[in-house]
């Protein structure tokens, strides 16, 4: 077969691509850092995170009570508050400063403050206030304290309305306290828990962040092992852009195809989280998401000079990326600039799409905007990766030629010196 024929070039390109794939796959399993980020972290971290929030809600949250009113109504408020399964009136303090010291020592997670004029204002027909102070370091404890206090206050308000309503029958009192009856039926997050709300987004974000860390660390290793500190080695197998890009991308796509199915199907089932995922829908959704993450990571790998650099580039972005998706903060309240900035990352559309698939049972047709955006990102980042690797290949060849010329000049100088001797 002639070397100039098209068939020979295709076969040679496939052979080189397989060689690059084999080399990269071997490096993934031999490099401890890459192995940790690409295999161990995606396997272990979701289990730890899911186990932490497996209970969905917290019970018996310790609370400090500051009752300066010492009235019948204030005692009723405290008694009803303590009767809730979510909170516990652990300490009774004489001042707000004393309660603050308990919060500082982490003995309690919140304070209920009832002022001295609480009952007096109620008897005058004025609006009374109850202060609720919560430790915001853990959202679950904040939710338990605040919602319980709000529920008790609503119940006492209903009793005040009934006493002042002047009704003659129980039905009159019922209408006075609850003029509009409604049934609260959670449609998607049936437990109302933190795990079902946040975990789907975290799982998808883990997929992207660990991939970026693994690809970046592998790129840093390649530069450190290269004599010229280049990303691409000068070799006959690394002679074309597409064979390099496809060879490297195949490695991470194969690894994270398995990890993606594990994170989206296995982990939610293990811990009993709400999951309405069908394997056909998730397969179609993960295909563009993983590809876009792979090409995004390969494109960014040119910025990594040393193995440690990738930690600075990737790790600190995890929490901001989660916020910018709109999963833990309303998307309508995110400034337009940050919403546009979030479109750069595949995790933005990946989290939004997977949350609808997992919690709402959406099909690919229902998440068409996110699905299209992921395919657009795949195409854009693939072209960007090809351009980046083209520049890296040129730089590697240029430095290799300069090194060879310098070596030849040194050899000629040595020969001249020997001839003179």
Give the location of each predicted region.
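Extracytoplasmic/periplasmic domains immediately adjacent to an N-terminal transmembrane anchor
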Residues: 1-196, 366, 391, 397-421
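Hydrophobic alpha-helical segments typical of transmembrane helices
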Residues: 73-77, 148, 215, 295, ...
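Membrane-spanning alpha-helical segments of multipass transporters and channels
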Residues: 48-49, 70, 91, 101, ...
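Loop-to-transmembrane-helix entry motif
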Residues: 28-35, 206, 247-253, 257, ...
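Hydrophobic alpha-helical transmembrane segments of integral membrane proteins
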Residues: 38-39, 196-197, 316-317, 342
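Hydrophobic core positions of alpha-helical segments in small-molecule transporters
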Residues: 37-38, 200, 246-247, 310-313, ...
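Alpha-helical membrane-protein architecture signal
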Residues: 14, 18-22, 196, 237-250, ...
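Hydrophobic alpha-helical transmembrane segments of multi-pass membrane transport proteins
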Residues: 44-47, 185-268
């Amino acid at each position: 077969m002639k070397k100039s024929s098209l068939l020979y070039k295709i076969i040679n390109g496939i052979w080189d691509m397989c060689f690059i794939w084999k080399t990269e796959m071997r490096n993934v399993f031999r490099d401890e850092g890459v192995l940790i980020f690409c295999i161990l972290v995606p396997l272990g971290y979701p289990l730890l995170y899911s186990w932490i929030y497996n209970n969905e809600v917290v019970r018996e949250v310790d609370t400090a009570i500051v009752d300066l009113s010492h009235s019948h109504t204030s005692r009723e408020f405290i008694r009803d508050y303590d009767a809730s399964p979510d909170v516990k009136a652990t300490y009774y303090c004489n001042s707000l400063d004393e309660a603050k010291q308990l919060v500082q020592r982490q003995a309690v997670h919140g304070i209920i403050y009832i002022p001295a004029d609480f009952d007096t204002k109620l008897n005058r027909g004025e609006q009374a206030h109850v202060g609720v102070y919560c430790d915001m370091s853990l959202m679950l404890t904040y939710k338990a304290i605040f919602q319980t206090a709000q529920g008790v206050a609503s119940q006492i308000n209903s009793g005040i309305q009934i006493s002042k309503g002047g009704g003659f029958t129980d039905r009159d009192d019922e209408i006075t306290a609850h003029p509009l009856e409604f049934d609260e039926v959670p449609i998607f997050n049936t437990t109302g828990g933190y795990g079902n709300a946040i975990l789907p987004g975290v799982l998808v974000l883990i997929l992207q962040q660990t991939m970026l860390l693994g690809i970046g660390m592998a790129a840093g290793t390649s530069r450190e092992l290269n004599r010229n500190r280049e990303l691409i080695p000068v070799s006959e197998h690394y002679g074309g852009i597409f064979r390099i890009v496809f060879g490297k991308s195949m490695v991470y796509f194969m690894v994270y195809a398995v990890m993606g199915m594990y994170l989206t199907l296995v982990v939610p089932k293990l811990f009993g989280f709400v999951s309405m995922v069908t394997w056909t829908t998730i397969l179609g959704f993960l295909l563009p998401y993983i590809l876009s993450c792979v090409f995004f990571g390969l494109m960014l790998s040119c910025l990594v000079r040393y193995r440690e650099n990738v930690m600075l580039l990737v790790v600190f972005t995890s929490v901001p990326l989660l916020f910018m998706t709109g999963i833990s903060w309303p998307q309508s309240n995110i400034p337009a600039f940050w919403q546009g900035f979030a479109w750069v990352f595949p995790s933005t559309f990946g989290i939004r799409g997977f949350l609808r698939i997992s919690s709402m049972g959406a099909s690919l047709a229902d998440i068409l905007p996110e699905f299209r955006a992921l395919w657009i990102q795949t195409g854009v980042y693939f072209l960007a990766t090809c351009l980046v690797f083209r520049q890296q290949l040129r730089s590697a060849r240029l430095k290799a030629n300069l090194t060879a010329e310098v070596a030849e000049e040194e050899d000629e100088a040595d020969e001249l010196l020997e001839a003179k001797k």
